[in-house]
UniProtKB/Swiss-Prot annotation:
GO terms for molecular function: S-adenosylmethionine-dependent methyltransferase activity; tRNA (5-carboxymethyluridine(34)-5-O)-methyltransferase activity; tRNA binding. The gene is trm9. The keyword Transferase applies. Its EC number is 2.1.1.229. It comes from Schizosaccharomyces pombe (strain 972 / ATCC 24843) (Fission yeast). Its main location: cytoplasm. GO terms for cellular component: cytoplasm; cytosol; nucleus. One of its GO terms (biological process) is tRNA wobble uridine modification. It catalyses: 5-(carboxymethyl)uridine(34) in tRNA + S-adenosyl-L-methionine = 5-(2-methoxy-2-oxoethyl)uridine(34) in tRNA + S-adenosyl-L-homocysteine. The keyword Protein biosynthesis does not apply. This is tRNA (carboxymethyluridine(34)-5-O)-methyltransferase. SUPFAM superfamilies: S-adenosyl-L-methionine-dependent methyltransferases (SSF53335).
Length: 228
């Protein structure tokens, strides 16, 4: 049931919006950039749910393998470094081998608590003992949210992605796109679980991580954890 649901409201959506999504994702978030640049020279890690691979070149002194379920995003990211197509619950990496891991804006797309826990465990599994992982998830408590989220609202929501016409019809000629009413753009609904304050921390600790740092940034909760 959950697999079919996520396939419809997460995976199929990203397959359709991949190019448009990638074109809006190019600037590293400061917390992620700081984490990557703090890693020792020669560190080897994984970026699980890497999207278009925008973090691949942040620190040229580390080696990072990206993975994502979306084939189109992996093709885009493959120009930046080593990439694999992989589901977030079954990544093809050996256990206890990597120094660090990223999970940026991924866990909130899993549709129940057990699957979210499995996803966090799968981020920690490839790490050596003491390896570090950085997690980012959307927050329920979004200050001054333009999306209308609040701590009194529901945690499981749909968030629309308005696909611009040139991405819906990539082979159309420019003159064919002129005069288009933006109201006719297609809205694809993506599923999100909005995390309450402390919920990500509890999930990471249950999965076998120890919290080193945590905070709030850009409408997200984030955690840096060490594998026990």
């Amino acid at each position: 049931m959950e697999i079919e649901y996520e396939n419809e409201y997460v995976h199929q959506v990203y397959d359709k919006i991949a190019t448009h999504f990638s074109d809006t994702r190019y600037k590293p978030w400061p917390v992620v950039e700081k984490f990557l640049k703090s890693l020792p020279l020669g560190s080897v890690g994984v970026d699980i749910g890497c999207g278009n691979g925008k973090y691949q070149k942040v620190n040229p002194n580390v080696y990072m393998i990206g993975s994502d379920r979306c084939v189109k995003l992996v093709k885009i990211a493959s120009n930046l470094g080593p990439m694999v197509i992989s589901d977030g619950l079954h990544v093809p990496h050996p256990s206890n081998r990597f120094d660090f891991a990223l999970s940026i804006a991924v866990i909130h797309h899993f549709s129940n608590e057990n699957r979210r826990l499995q996803a966090v465990q799968e981020v920690l599994r490839p790490l050596v003992k003491g390896g570090k992982a950085l997690f980012f998830v959307w927050a329920l408590e979004q200050k001054n949210s333009r999306r209308g989220f609040s701590e009194d609202g529901p945690q499981d929501v749909y968030v629309p992605w308005i696909l611009k016409r040139q991405y819906e019809y990539p082979n159309a000629k420019p003159e064919e796109l002129k005069g288009h009413d933006p109201a006719e753009n297609i809205a694809y609904q993506r599923y999100y679980h909005l995390f309450r304050k402390g919920e990500l921390n509890e999930l990471v600790e249950t999965a076998g991580g120890s919290i080193l740092e945590h905070g709030y940034d850009r409408d997200n909760w984030w955690v840096i954890a060490e594998k026990n």
